[in-house]
UniProtKB/Swiss-Prot annotation:
Ribonucleoprotein found in the keyword field: no
Entry GO terms, CC: cytoplasm
Family: Belongs to the class-A beta-lactamase family.
Practical application: Directed evolutionary mutagenesis has created an enzyme with 40-fold higher stability in organic solvents.
Annotated Gene3D superfamilies: DD-peptidase/beta-lactamase superfamily (3.40.710.10)
Keyword Nucleotide-binding: no
UniProt organism field: Burkholderia gladioli
Thermal activity profile: Optimum temperature is 43 degrees Celsius.
Top-rank taxon, per record: Bacteria
Protein known as: Esterase EstB
Coiled coil stretches, renumbered: none
Subcellular location(s) of the protein: Cytoplasm
Keywords for the protein's UniProt record, in alphabetical order: Cytoplasm, Hydrolase
Length: 392
C-alpha cells in the first residue's frame, strides 16, 4: 500500500469500520500467539476514534490488559524527554547550537584520531553526534568492553558514571557528518538536570507531564500490580522476560537488547532519558497530540523545526525515505518507504514492544503499546495496524 491514492482532503475514518478492521488485526495476532497483550489508540484531530485493550497483561496469572495498564516505555521515552529539552530551548535556558560542554564540561568524547570535536544540543537531538549504543554494537565491541549501559538494563552505577564511560568511547563519525541511533537522549537527560537544577524525573514532570496532563508516567514506580508483564518473541508463544535476558534484535535493527524488567521499580536506577520512563497509553497519546497539534506548547517555529527532517533522507533512519527531526524519524519520501503515510509523518517505537506514528497531513495520532518484544515494535502487527488505519 502506498500514499498515492490517499488525498488528505478526501480522507475520512468511520469509527465503527475502523474498530472492526483493527479488532480483526489484534484477533489474528492473539490467535497466532504472536502477541500477549496491547493497548491501541487512534485519534484524528484530537478525537479518539479507537481505544481498546487487547489480550493479557500477565499471561500466567490470567490478568487482562486494561486501558490504564502501565508499560515500560523504552524509546518512547525519547520524544517525551526531547520535548523537555525543547521547552528549555524555548525559554532560552538551552540553545540548539550550543556545545554540550556548556552544561556537561566533563563530557568530551573524541574521534578515533584523538581530536575533540564540538558536540551540540542539535547533534544530540538528531542522533548526528557520532555516539552509539551497546544494542547496536553487541558483545566484544568497545561499548561492551567499557560496560556502557543502554538504560534498559540494570547496573550498579549512576548516570554520571555511564556518561564518563560513554565519553571514553570513540565517536563513530564527526558530529553532523552522519546518523546513528544512540545514547544521545541519556546525555540530554543529564543536560536537563544541570540546566534546571532538578532530577530528571522532576524536570520532565514540570516541563512536560504536568502541562500536558500526563498523570501516570515517570521513571520509578511503586505500583508493580499496574504494569504489563513483558515478553519476548518465541515459539510456540512469547517468552516471559527476566532480568538480564539478552534478546537478539530483528535483522537490520542492531545486535541485541539486555532487558531488566525490574529496573522501573528500583529507586536507585539512574534516570535514562532515552529509555527509562513508564506510562499509560493515554499519557503517551497526550505527548503525541502535543507533537501533532502544538497547542501553544512550543513556539511554532521551534515546533516546525522539531517536526522537520534535520538529518537528511540519506540517513534512512527507518529505511529508504526516512530522515530524523528533533523528536523521531520523519518521512520524506512515502514512495521510497513503501508506506501509505504522508510526507512529514513522524514515527518511532520502543524495544519493549511499542510503535507510534503521527501523520500530520491527516491529523492522525496512532499508538500501539504492547508487552511483546519485538512484535509490537517492528513485527507484522505494526504493518497490519498501519494498513488497517489507511484502508479504504
Amino acid at each position: 500500500m502506498t500514499a498515492a491514492s490517499l488525498d488528505p482532503t478526501a480522507f475520512s475514518l468511520d469509527a465503527a469500520s475502523l474498530a472492526a478492521r483493527l479488532d480483526a488485526v489484534f484477533d489474528q495476532a492473539l490467535r497466532e500467539r504472536r502477541l500477549v497483550g496491547a493497548v491501541a489508540i487512534v485519534a484524528r484531530h484530537g478525537e479518539i476514534l479507537y481505544r481498546r485493550a487487547q489480550g493479557l497483561a500477565d499471561r500466567e496469572a490470567g490478568r487482562p490488559m486494561r486501558e490504564d495498564t502501565l508499560f515500560r516505555l523504552a524509546s518512547v521515552t525519547k520524544p517525551i524527554v526531547a520535548l523537555a529539552v525543547l521547552r528549555l530551548v524555548a525559554r532560552g535556558e538551552l540553545a540548539l547550537d550550543a556545545p554540550v560542554t556548556r552544561w556537561l564540561p566533563e563530557f568530551r568524547p573524541r574521534l578515533a584520531d584523538g581530536s575533540e570535536p564540538l558536540v551540540t544540543i542539535h547533534h544530540l537531538l538528531t542522533h548526528t553526534s557520532g555516539l552509539g549504543y551497546w544494542l547496536l554494537e553487541g558483545a566484544g565491541s568497545v561499548y561492551d568492553r567499557l560496560g556502557i549501559s543502554d538504560g534498559i538494563d540494570l547496573r550498579d552505577f549512576d548516570l554520571d558514571e555511564n556518561l564518563r564511560r560513554l565519553a571514553s568511547a570513540p565517536l563513530s563519525f564527526a558530529p553532523g557528518s552522519g546518523w546513528q541511533y544512540s545514547l544521545a537522549l541519556d546525555v540530554l537527560g543529564a543536560v536537563v538536570e544541570r540546566a534546571t537544577g532538578q532530577p530528571l524525573a522532576a524536570a520532565v514532570d514540570a516541563l512536560v507531564a504536568q502541562p500536558l496532563g500526563m498523570r501516570d508516567c515517570g521513571f520509578v514506580s511503586a505500583e508493580p500490580e499496574r504494569f504489563a508483564v513483558p515478553y519476548h518473541d518465541g515459539q510456540p508463544e512469547p517468552v516471559r522476560m527476566r532480568d538480564g535476558i539478552e534478546v537478539p534484535l530483528p535483522e537490520g535493527h542492531g545486535a541485541a537488547v539486555r532487558f531488566a524488567p525490574s529496573r522501573v521499580f528500583e529507586p536507585g536506577a539512574y534516570p535514562s532519558g532515552g529509555a527509562g520512563m513508564y506510562g499509560s497509553a493515554d499519557d503517551v497519546l497526550r505527548a503525541l497530540e502535543a507533537i501533532r497539534a502544538n497547542p501553544g506548547f512550543l513556539p511554532e517555529t521551534l515546533a516546525d523545526a522539531a517536526r522537520r527532517d534535520q538529518a537528511g533522507v540519506g540517513a534512512e533512519t527507518r529505511g529508504p525515505g526516512w530522515g530524523f527531526g528533533y523528536l523521531s524519524a520523519v518521512l520524506d519520501d512515502p514512495a521510497a518507504a513503501g508506506t501509505p503515510q504522508h510526507a512529514g509523518t513522524l514515527q518511532w517505537g520502543g524495544v519493549y514492544g511499542h510503535s507510534w506514528f503521527v501523520d500530520r497531513a491527516l491529523g492522525l495520532s496512532v499508538l500501539l503499546l504492547t508487552n511483546t518484544a519485538y512484535e509490537g515494535m517492528s513485527g507484522p502487527l505494526t504493518i497490519a495496524l498501519r494498513d488497517a488505519v489507511y484502508a479504504r
